[in-house]
């Protein structure tokens, strides 16, 4: 199981993308013949006084101040003029599903795009629930944009298949290119990265985050410009290959604007010391291995604490791969200013952890392995009163492992960190009382993801289902937009979600529910639902049909190892032609040929994709 520890923030999916499918006839025109006579006269009079191009110029200047996707979406729906001007003034586009529209539709609608955020595979791909060759290819997007957007400056991809050729075309096509962010992507190697480093002379951001990067034995670090660079952020902690440290040291020295640097595990603590002395301006640091060289180059060990002390601007700290505990005190000098700390790769004990966290009074974001135990979480609760986001990952993700964190840690956090807004908590045991306490103590929660790793586990004290705990979360946390549920849950828990989860946009369900009625409660009761992820739950055809009135308004529905039939999926595909219904991995040669192993449904403006592999059947 792959944990998504890519960024110290939640996905920015709470705002809708602008409508790309609206023809001009679908938008109300205040000058149309359907308007009332008075409105028509007023509109004609106004157009005579102020020509259309004057009004559009004024509107163009106004819309430039709208940054929110949601606001721009609303503006584009006012009338044809607003729709047209909004498209002309939009420089940033977010596409939450690369198959929701074609690249051609994007370039036809928006002519001046400088920044693109594009997402591919659904999130359950992170848990090995999707075959690796499913799709989400970047190739058609970069080839289309190469012709349409010569001024493109930023590409941010997540769960996309990106090849070295794609990166080469990107580097050749956009002379002013500045930012490349690849999160959980695959298909490319150090050869492609070297081309970007060499040809994108204005590059400010190169962030490779949780991506699978092939080692082509290319010295990509040496491919950056030999003179002063524009680099502001360089993250390559996911690159599982040695790097040319001398070239890296020179690159850091030539990058006076560098604020973020995240190193891979092949950079030792001694080398980190040298980098810090040459880059005191850093604000975000990923430390690399945090262990010394196997063969020290000198008898006297460097003063690591002094190097950290020189970096007075560091507020975000991560890394700590291959951690050697005796060196951990070196970070003491920066702890007081930290707002973000990521120990999610460090197997650190409570005794090692507590001296660190007790100095982090400004911390707002904290990620860690469950090796810090309940004792460590109690120290967090006692110290970090400004905490907004907490993520606790399992050191041992097996279902039958002994989890070192429990309801005790969760209860402590809820009592000590009253400003908490987002939590992801992996554990082996939990109680309703602890979850209810969190709902009462942390009413500002927008994200609550509780992952009880053992299947169908009840409240381990009372033996009852976890219904009341999750019910309290949706009832008391009025701002909740994202919810992940687990443990022993009956239909009652889902009834609570449908009754109180009016703002929930993303719901993840694993091993939960009694019957189809559970899913029906959610589909009929959660009007804002956009993303629905379900695995190993007893929901079947009746449940799926109950949401047909909702699917056009949702980004996607994912259901795996449930009780769906291919016949039901075909019926939905026939009834909803603008909904793409993919059946993944079903075997037609056995007795269960009508059984659907995995269903992935999503809305699309351009119909089914043309690159589906053989194991995908589009109904």
From Swiss-Prot:
GO terms for molecular function: auxin binding; inositol hexakisphosphate binding. CDD domains: F-box_AtTIR1-like. It is found in: Nucleus. Residues 1-43 are annotated as: Disordered. Residues 126-127, 394-399, 451-455, 510-511 are annotated as: Interaction with auxin-responsive proteins. Residues 54-97 form the F-box domain. Part of a SCF (SKP1-cullin-F-box) protein ligase complex. May interact with auxin and auxin-responsive proteins. The myo-inositol hexakisphosphate acts as a structural cofactor. This is Transport inhibitor response 1-like protein. It comes from Arabidopsis thaliana.
């Amino acid at each position: 199981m792959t944990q998504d520890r890519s960024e110290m923030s939640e996905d920015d999916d709470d705002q809708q993308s602008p409508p790309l499918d609206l023809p001009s006839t679908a938008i109300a025109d205040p000058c149309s013949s359907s308007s009332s006579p008075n409105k028509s006269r007023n509109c004609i009079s106004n157009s005579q006084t102020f020509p259309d191009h004057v009004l559009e110029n004024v509107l163009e200047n106004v819309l430039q101040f709208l940054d929110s996707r949601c606001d721009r979406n609303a503006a584009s729906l006012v009338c044809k003029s607003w729709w047209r001007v909004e498209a002309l003034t939009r420089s940033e586009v977010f596409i939450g599903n690369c198959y929701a529209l074609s690249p051609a539709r994007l370039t036809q609608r928006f002519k001046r795009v400088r920044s693109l955020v594009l997402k591919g595979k659904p999130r359950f791909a992170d848990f090995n629930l999707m075959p690796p060759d499913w799709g989400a290819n970047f190739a058609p997007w970069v080839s289309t944009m190469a012709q349409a957007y010569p001024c493109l400056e930023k590409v941010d991809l997540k769960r996309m298949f990106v090849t070295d050729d794609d990166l080469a075309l990107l580097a050749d096509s956009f002379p002013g290119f500045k930012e490349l962010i690849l999160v959980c992507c695959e298909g490319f190697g150090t050869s492609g990265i070297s081309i970007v480093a060499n040809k994108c002379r204005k590059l400010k951001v190169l962030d490779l985050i949780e991506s699978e990067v092939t080692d082509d034995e290319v010295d990509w670090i040496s491919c950056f410009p030999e003179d002063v660079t524009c680099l502001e952020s360089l993250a390559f902690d996911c690159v599982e290959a040695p790097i040319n440290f001398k070239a890296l040291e020179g690159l850091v020295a030539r990058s006076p604007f560098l604020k973020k640097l995240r190193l891979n595990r092949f950079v030792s603590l001694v080398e980190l010391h040298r980098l810090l002395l040459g880059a005191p301006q850093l604000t975000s640091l990923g430390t690399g291995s945090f262990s010394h060289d196997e063969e020290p180059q000198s008898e006297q060990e460097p003063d690591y604490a002094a190097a950290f002390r020189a970096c007075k601007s560091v507020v975000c700290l991560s890394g700590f791969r291959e951690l050697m505990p005796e060196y951990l005190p070196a970070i003491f000098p920066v702890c007081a200013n930290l707002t973000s700390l990521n120990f999610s790769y460090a197997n650190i004990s409570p005794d090692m952890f507590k001296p660190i966290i007790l100095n982090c009074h400004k911390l707002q974001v904290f990620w860690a392995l469950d090796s810090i135990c309940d004792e460590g979480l109690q120290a967090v609760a006692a110290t970090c009163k400004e905490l907004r986001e907490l993520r606790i990952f399992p050191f041992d993700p097996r279902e039958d492992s002994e989890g070192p964190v429990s309801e005790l840690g969760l209860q402590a956090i809820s009592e000590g960190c009253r400003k908490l807004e987002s939590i992801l908590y992996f554990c082996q045991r939990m109680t309703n009382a602890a979850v209810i306490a969190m709902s009462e103590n942390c009413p500002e929660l927008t994200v609550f993801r509780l992952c009880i790793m053992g299947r169908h586990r009840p409240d381990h004290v009372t033996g009852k289902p976890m219904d009341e705990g999750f019910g309290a979360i949706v009832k008391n946390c009025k701002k909740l937009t994202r919810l992940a549920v687990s443990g022993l849950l009956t239909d009652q828990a889902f009834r609570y979600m449908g009754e109180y989860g009016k703002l929930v946009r993303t719901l993840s369900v694993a091993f939960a529910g009694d019957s189809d009625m559970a899913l029906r409660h959610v589909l009929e009761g959660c009007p804002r639902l956009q993303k629905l992820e379900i695995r190993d739950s007893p929901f079947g055809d009746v449940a799926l049909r109950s949401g047909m009135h909702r699917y056009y308004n949702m980004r996607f529905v994912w259901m795996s190892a449930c009780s769906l039939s291919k016949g039901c999926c075909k019926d939905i595909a026939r009834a909803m032609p603008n909904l793409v219904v993919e059946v993944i991995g079903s075997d037609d040669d056995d007795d269960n040929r009508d059984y659907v192993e995995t269903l992935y449904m999503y809305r699309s403006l351009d119909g089914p994709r043309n690159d589906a592999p053989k194991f995908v059947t589009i109904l």
